[in-house]
């Protein structure tokens, strides 16, 4: 899904936020490999790099020599550019506060921009593990609970089925969301209800032309064996999308 989204915006500047350093590196390699045909380049950016390596990547991105930076959420806040046209969260953000700041990296020049978040329900458990920590770095106490509560708010935001994500996000911080966008694009929920933004129906297919001829003999079929459910109970889900 990230590849298709970035492909449709080839030549534009973007940020992809990833959960871990390994995710950021894998995402950058995948985008560069799959988007060679449109000339899109990507590179990872995280705390595991040396200061010189990060400086080189940031300079290339600032100068337009690099299209996409795949950054960890924890370290990607330091990168900034006015003409970022899109921000993608390849996984669930840790909080609405963090998402608001990260998504705000797009469109700082005042031009239209887009934000996309891909998530699965099981991402909540993964982020909870990161927040709780491991071994000697395992966290406890009220600060951990506060972070877990913020994660719950983020999950509820992603699970919205109606309403407006923009109004929900702005209202979370006690601000007036202002008037609606009318017939213009807003969030995925509003756009789905907006007739002006619905794609036109596909053109009807021409009727099939049947050629007359002698009947084709059909081979005799053996009785079909009993069908066995090879998949079983699968927990896999298609990534859900949230755009605000």
Each language-model region and where it sits:
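Accessible peptide chain termini
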Residues: 1, 243-244
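Helicase motor core with emphasis on the C-terminal RecA-like subdomain
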Residues: 1-139, 178-179
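C-terminal accessory region of SF2 helicases/translocases
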Residues: 66, 83-84, 92-101, 107-236, ...
């Amino acid at each position: 899904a990230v590849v298709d989204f970035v492909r449709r915006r080839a030549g534009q500047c973007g940020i992809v936020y990833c959960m871990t350093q390994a995710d950021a590196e894998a995402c950058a390699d995948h985008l560069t490999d799959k988007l060679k045909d449109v000339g899109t380049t990507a590179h990872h950016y995280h705390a595991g790099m040396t200061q010189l390596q990060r400086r080189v990547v940031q300079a290339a991105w600032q100068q337009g020599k690099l299209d996409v930076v795949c950054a960890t959420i924890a370290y990607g806040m330091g990168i900034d550019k006015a003409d970022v046209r899109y921000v993608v969260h390849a996984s669930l953000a840790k909080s609405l506060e963090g998402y608001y700041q990260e998504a705000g990296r797009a469109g700082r020049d005042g031009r239209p921009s887009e934000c996309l978040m891909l998530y699965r329900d099981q991402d909540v458990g993964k982020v909870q593990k990161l927040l709780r920590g491991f071994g000697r770095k395992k966290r406890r106490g009220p600060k951990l609970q506060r972070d877990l509560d913020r994660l719950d708010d983020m999950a509820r935001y992603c699970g919205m089925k109606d309403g407006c994500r923009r109004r929900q996000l702005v209202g979370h911080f006690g601000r007036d969301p202002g008037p609606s966008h009318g017939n213009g694009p807003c969030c995925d929920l509003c756009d789905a209800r907006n007739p002006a933004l619905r794609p036109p129906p596909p053109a009807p297919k021409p009727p099939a032309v049947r050629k007359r001829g002698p009947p084709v003999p059909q081979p005799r079929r053996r009785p079909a064996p009993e069908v066995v459910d090879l998949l079983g109970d699968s927990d896999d889900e298609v990534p859900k999308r949230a755009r605000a």
